[in-house]
Amino acid sequence: MGQKVHPIGIRLGVVKKHNANWYASPKQYSEYLINDIQVREYLRKKLDSAMISKIMIERPTGAAKITIATARPGIVIGKKGEDIERLQKELTKMMGVPAQVNIEEITSPDLDAHLVAEGIASQLERRVMFRRAMKRAVQNSMRSGAKGIKVELSGRLGGAEIARTEWYREGRVPLHTLRADIDYSSVRAETTYGTIGVKVWIFRGEILDGMNSVYNPVKEEQTRAPKRRGRGNGNRRNTDRG
């Protein structure tokens, strides 16, 4: 029986980056790993309303660098940067080394699988009809420029006594094409009828240059056509004969 591999795990080193970049000895490896899990749980709990998608952790020698990808950077930074300074001090205590926090703004939340899944889960917890929540998320993502999206819900949908799985897809979602930029996330919605699993796959196009374009993104320059002058603009010749 065939099983689906994790869409991001199979693309690591091909078109996807790791969320943790550090090297450690066998003795330190487990300590760093547990510390990373604690830091991520702490940040997601403390910044629950900041719409955090990813938390990248790097550990250069004698320091720590944490990059938070969020759709609401103002909540993380706070007034005059007070919140982010306080956050850096707390993370320094947790990690035991000076911690630097960087903010990466997500300009298109509808193209981020984790934020879309969190949005669907919050709607289910507010007792919104699950089919309406699925279709609304799919339409918003396709309107924002996604090439394809698939949403899958599992559990006691609509309060049914028997759990089942339903999914909705629009566009293309090529899971076996390694150059395809597939974003994936799975979250849980805690409803009055029990836990409902939410999975989201978003196809955002193909990455042809591999990791070069991932580590060195080049912004496409928008070339505008020259403006055409109307008949009333420009220099006029004086044709009046007096």
From Swiss-Prot:
InterPro entries the UniProt entry points to: KH_dom, KH_dom-like_a/b, KH_dom_type_2, KH_sf_prok-type, Ribosomal_S3_C_sf, Ribosomal_uS3_bac-typ, Ribosomal_uS3_C, Ribosomal_uS3_CS
Protein's GO biological process = translation
Transmembrane spans: none
Keyword Transcription regulation (UniProt): no
| Entry keywords, A to Z | Ribonucleoprotein, Ribosomal protein, RNA-binding, rRNA-binding
Q: Where is this region: Disordered?
A: 218-242
State a single Pfam family of this protein: Ribosomal_S3_C
Q: Which GO terms describe its cellular component?
A: cytosolic small ribosomal subunit
Domain KH type-2, chain residue ranges per copy: 39-107
- Any GO molecular function: rRNA binding
Subunit note: Part of the 30S ribosomal subunit. Forms a tight complex with proteins S10 and S14.
Annotated function: Binds the lower part of the 30S subunit head. Binds mRNA in the 70S ribosome, positioning it for translation.
Similarity comment: Belongs to the universal ribosomal protein uS3 family.
- Output the NCBIfam families linked to this UniProt entry: rpsC_bact (TIGR01009)
User: What is the designated name of this protein?
Assistant: Small ribosomal subunit protein uS3
Organism this protein belongs to: Psychrobacter arcticus (strain DSM 17307 / VKM B-2377 / 273-4)
